[in-house]
Amino acid sequence: MTRGNARELAIHLIFGREFTGETPSEVVRMRLEEGYYEQLAAEYEIYTERPTEKQVKYLENIVAGVVEHQEELNEIVGKFSIGWDVKRISRLNRVIMQLAAYEILYVDDVPEGVAVSEAVRLAKKYDDEMGKFVNGILGSFVRSLKENPAEEAPAVEEV
């Protein structure tokens, strides 16, 4: 499974968790159960390849990180979505931008440009019209970090 596919899977997990309220660990483990995962493979290509144990750890870390920082990430999305109330942004696009903002702030081995490009790719995959919107918000966020580097949050070590 590529990192891009793992990122898309993380989007599905975070999105689904918003409806169930499960802990990040629960949502990852439950969605990766044999029967459930195989059932999803019939609908989504990314589920045709099972993640390795290392990739499961990555998914757990990224889902937990986004959930832990969700309020901060929503504030970022809100700050840069000028003229939009965060609640009016579709839940899926909000989750896509939360994940990208989390990677930009807290994941050292993901360059900012990759996080933005992947978010745009995922937004377009699910809603072709949202690519520019997501790019605009995340691009403004990245530019603000370059203009005010003291505002950037410290990186969290990966486990």
Segments predicted by a language model, with ranges:
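N-terminal interaction/assembly modules
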Residues: 1-159
